[in-house]
Protein backbone atom coordinates (compact mmCIF):
# COMPACT_ATOMS: atom_id res chain seq x y z
CA UNK A 1 0.00 0.00 0.00
CA UNK A 2 1.26 3.45 -0.84
CA UNK A 3 2.04 5.98 1.88
CA UNK A 4 0.12 9.23 2.16
CA UNK A 5 3.02 11.08 0.53
CA UNK A 6 3.09 8.64 -2.39
CA UNK A 7 -0.67 8.91 -2.87
CA UNK A 8 -0.52 12.72 -2.81
CA UNK A 9 2.41 12.72 -5.24
CA UNK A 10 0.56 10.35 -7.59
CA UNK A 11 -2.51 12.59 -7.44
CA UNK A 12 -0.34 15.66 -8.16
CA UNK A 13 1.51 13.87 -10.97
CA UNK A 14 -1.78 12.91 -12.66
CA UNK A 15 -2.78 16.58 -12.67
CA UNK A 16 0.70 17.71 -13.83
CA UNK A 17 1.08 19.78 -10.65
CA UNK A 18 4.48 18.30 -9.74
CA UNK A 19 5.73 19.02 -13.26
CA UNK A 20 5.85 22.71 -12.35
CA UNK A 21 8.88 24.36 -10.81
CA UNK A 22 8.69 24.98 -7.06
CA UNK A 23 6.91 28.28 -6.47
CA UNK A 24 7.65 29.85 -3.12
CA UNK A 25 5.12 32.66 -3.47
CA UNK A 26 2.41 30.33 -4.77
CA UNK A 27 3.05 27.92 -1.92
CA UNK A 28 2.88 30.69 0.68
CA UNK A 29 -0.34 31.97 -0.89
CA UNK A 30 -1.96 28.52 -0.66
CA UNK A 31 -0.87 28.09 2.96
CA UNK A 32 -2.15 31.55 3.92
CA UNK A 33 -5.49 30.74 2.26
CA UNK A 34 -5.75 27.53 4.29
CA UNK A 35 -4.78 29.37 7.49
CA UNK A 36 -7.63 31.77 6.74
CA UNK A 37 -10.00 28.82 6.40
CA UNK A 38 -8.65 27.45 9.69
CA UNK A 39 -9.38 30.76 11.44
CA UNK A 40 -12.83 31.05 9.84
CA UNK A 41 -13.71 27.58 11.13
CA UNK A 42 -13.71 28.92 14.72
CA UNK A 43 -15.54 26.19 16.67
CA UNK A 44 -15.96 23.91 13.62
CA UNK A 45 -13.43 21.19 14.45
CA UNK A 46 -13.87 19.38 11.14
CA UNK A 47 -13.31 22.64 9.26
CA UNK A 48 -10.05 23.10 11.14
CA UNK A 49 -9.03 19.48 10.46
CA UNK A 50 -9.77 19.99 6.75
CA UNK A 51 -7.63 23.15 6.61
CA UNK A 52 -4.72 21.44 8.40
CA UNK A 53 -4.95 18.40 6.12
CA UNK A 54 -4.92 20.67 3.06
CA UNK A 55 -1.75 22.31 4.39
CA UNK A 56 -0.14 18.87 4.61
CA UNK A 57 -1.21 18.11 1.02
CA UNK A 58 0.28 21.39 -0.24
CA UNK A 59 3.50 20.83 1.74
CA UNK A 60 3.93 17.28 0.42
CA UNK A 61 3.28 18.49 -3.13
CA UNK A 62 5.85 21.25 -2.82
CA UNK A 63 8.40 18.86 -1.30
CA UNK A 64 7.90 16.62 -4.35
CA UNK A 65 8.46 19.58 -6.69
CA UNK A 66 11.87 20.01 -5.07
CA UNK A 67 12.58 16.36 -5.83
CA UNK A 68 12.35 14.99 -2.30
CA UNK A 69 10.36 12.11 -0.81
CA UNK A 70 8.08 13.57 1.86
CA UNK A 71 8.07 10.51 4.10
CA UNK A 72 11.86 10.32 4.16
CA UNK A 73 12.05 14.06 4.85
CA UNK A 74 9.63 13.64 7.77
CA UNK A 75 11.68 10.72 9.13
CA UNK A 76 14.72 13.00 9.24
CA UNK A 77 12.78 15.85 10.84
CA UNK A 78 11.34 13.50 13.48
CA UNK A 79 14.85 12.21 14.26
CA UNK A 80 15.98 15.81 14.67
CA UNK A 81 13.18 16.92 16.99
CA UNK A 82 13.36 13.64 18.94
CA UNK A 83 17.03 14.27 19.74
CA UNK A 84 16.18 17.43 21.65
CA UNK A 85 15.42 17.59 25.33
CA UNK A 86 13.40 20.21 27.13
CA UNK A 87 10.06 20.73 28.79
CA UNK A 88 6.58 22.04 28.12
CA UNK A 89 6.06 25.56 29.45
CA UNK A 90 2.41 26.07 30.49
CA UNK A 91 2.89 29.85 30.59
CA UNK A 92 3.76 30.06 26.89
CA UNK A 93 1.91 26.86 25.93
CA UNK A 94 5.02 25.81 24.04
CA UNK A 95 7.65 23.14 24.36
CA UNK A 96 10.97 24.82 25.18
CA UNK A 97 14.07 23.00 24.05
CA UNK A 98 17.08 22.79 26.33
CA UNK A 99 19.74 24.99 24.71
CA UNK A 100 22.54 24.13 27.11
CA UNK A 101 25.84 23.12 25.49
CA UNK A 102 25.40 19.60 26.88
CA UNK A 103 21.96 19.25 25.29
CA UNK A 104 23.08 20.78 21.99
CA UNK A 105 25.93 18.28 21.80
CA UNK A 106 23.28 15.52 21.52
CA UNK A 107 21.16 17.26 18.87
CA UNK A 108 20.77 15.46 15.57
CA UNK A 109 20.66 17.61 12.44
CA UNK A 110 18.32 16.40 9.71
CA UNK A 111 20.23 15.08 6.71
CA UNK A 112 18.12 15.21 3.56
CA UNK A 113 20.83 13.75 1.30
CA UNK A 114 19.11 10.37 1.09
CA UNK A 115 15.62 11.83 0.81
CA UNK A 116 15.68 12.47 -2.94
CA UNK A 117 13.01 10.87 -5.10
Predicted regions and their residues:
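Flexible "arm" and connector segments at domain edges
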Residues: 1-52, 56-117
